[in-house]
């Protein structure tokens, strides 16, 4: 093993150990782990200039995003999804578009960014983080319908935001994209991703029917998560929707099997995998955030944060009918690693690239701390802890 490889492995192991330690501390103080991980990472990164052992970008997404998305989709409540399908679709598609355009309109109104660049920024920060939200909801007694809406919306929202990011990137790059062309591209990317995920899940299910060993089911689900994502990405459709569809379809098909022990083993594996990936990704997210840069453009930062949270408040009236549900929905709109990865993956030639990255740093940090920190405490106050469930 070369020195560089050994150093990278050691750095990754150290990051993992630190992430797990911080996650355990977060559980003790009842703060969402994602919040404490990012705050600790930002302090270490800004004060001691510690960098993660990998760079944020498409390669990172291909490694960490499939298992994180798969685990959330694997554990989602399908019965509640069916009941709330209309609300979820409204929030995920028109809702994400509304959020992106509202943020873009605010930034262009105060003249910190031209509208095409502002729309690119809006698309980036419209991607909420399902992992951080799910981690909180598993410890509280929130209504099943509200949980399903927030979890499914955050999954679908990420997929829509990534597609919109590609369209906005083409606009900023000088390509002429008519609204109907963009709409068609969005529909094809989402539909294509769902189709790819479904087509990948069916042969996986047929293969797993012949095997009664839990370790084969675990290996099969891991392979499926990556295969669906990579095939979809290769075909130019949504990898996030492909991975989500693959998990949902395979889970629905496997439910009919009688071997509950195997399913429990698969559940335990994915919970552990998500916990580890969550710890690494969010601590690395904090290390990437440069605190001085996050306040470098105060007008852009203030406008972006207010517009981001404000658009979430407006969508809360679609998500829930009562004050507790709306408050929970607003606070669950945390941003995480995906917006950072999208911002840092921007080509160098993109106008105002540095300002976009600075603004994304700020939005991710503020939404995680301001919205994420009180989330679990308030949801517990509204609905009670999980142990109160009858």
What spans do the regions from the language model cover?
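Transmembrane helical cores of multi-pass secondary ion antiporters/exchangers
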Residues: 1-390
């Amino acid at each position: 093993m070369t020195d560089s490889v050994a150093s990278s492995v050691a750095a990754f192991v150290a990051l993992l150990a630190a992430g797990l330690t911080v996650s355990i501390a977060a559980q003790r103080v009842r703060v969402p782990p994602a919040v404490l991980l990012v705050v600790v990472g930002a302090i270490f990164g800004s004060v001691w200039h510690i960098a993660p052992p990998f760079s944020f970008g498409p390669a990172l997404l291909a490694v960490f995003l499939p298992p994180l998305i798969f685990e959330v989709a694997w554990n989602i409540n399908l019965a509640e999804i069916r009941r709330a399908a209309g609300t979820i679709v409204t929030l995920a598609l028109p809702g994400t578009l509304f959020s992106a355009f509202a943020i873009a309109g605010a930034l262009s109104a105060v003249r910190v960014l031209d509208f095409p660049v502002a729309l690119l920024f809006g698309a980036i920060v419209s991607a909420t983080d399902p992992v951080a939200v799910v981690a909180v909801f598993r410890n509280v007694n929130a209504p099943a319908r509200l949980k399903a809406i927030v979890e499914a919306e955050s999954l679908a929202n990420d997929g829509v935001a990534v597609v919109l990011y590609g369209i906005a990137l083409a606009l900023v790059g000088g390509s002429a994209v008519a609204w109907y062309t963009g709409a068609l591209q969005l529909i094809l990317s989402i539909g294509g991703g769902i189709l790819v995920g479904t087509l990948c899940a069916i042969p996986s299910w047929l293969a797993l029917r012949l095997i009664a060993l839990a370790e084969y089911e675990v290996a099969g689900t891991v392979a499926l998560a990556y295969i669906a994502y990579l095939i979809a990405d290769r075909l130019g459709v949504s990898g996030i929707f492909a991975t989500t569809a693959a998990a949902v379809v395979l889970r629905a098909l496997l439910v009919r099997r009688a071997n509950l022990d195997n399913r429990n083993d698969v559940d335990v594996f994915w919970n552990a995998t998500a916990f580890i990936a969550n710890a690494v990704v969010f601590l690395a997210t904090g290390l990437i955030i440069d605190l001085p840069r996050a306040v470098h453009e105060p007008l852009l930062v203030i406008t972006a944060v207010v517009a981001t949270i404000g658009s979430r408040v407006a969508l809360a009236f679609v998500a829930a009918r009562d004050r507790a549900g709306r408050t929970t929905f607003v606070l669950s709109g945390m941003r995480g690693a995906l917006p950072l990865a999208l911002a840092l993956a921007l080509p160098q030639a993109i106008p105002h690239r540095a300002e976009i990255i600075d603004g994304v740093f700020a939005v991710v940090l503020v939404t995680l701390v301001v919205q994420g920190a009180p989330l679990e405490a308030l949801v517990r106050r509204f609905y009670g802890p999980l142990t109160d469930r009858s």
